[in-house]
């Protein structure tokens, strides 16, 4: 989970947005973290590079927990 938080904050920082300090498994990528479509695209690229998983391969991912499940099912 710490790596996912790091990646999320890297994406936010790269886009000039404020990093989040509180993220849990139920955090919604758009509503809670503030991601837009460009942030989600960068997140996808970074997670695929680090974990070899396309988190959007089977549809939309909305929460941190859904990302973790995709990585765990690899």
Describe the residue ranges of each PLM region.
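Conserved alpha-helix in the HATPase_c
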Residues: 42
């Amino acid at each position: 989970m710490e790596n996912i938080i790091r990646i999320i904050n890297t994406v936010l920082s790269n886009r000039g947005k404020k990093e989040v300090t509180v993220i849990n498994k139920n955090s919604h990528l758009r509503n809670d973290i503030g991601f837009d479509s460009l942030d989600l695209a960068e997140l996808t690229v970074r997670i695929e590079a680090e974990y070899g998983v396309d988190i959007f391969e089977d549809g939309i991912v909305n929460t941190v927990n859904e990302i973790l499940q995709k990585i765990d099912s690899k």
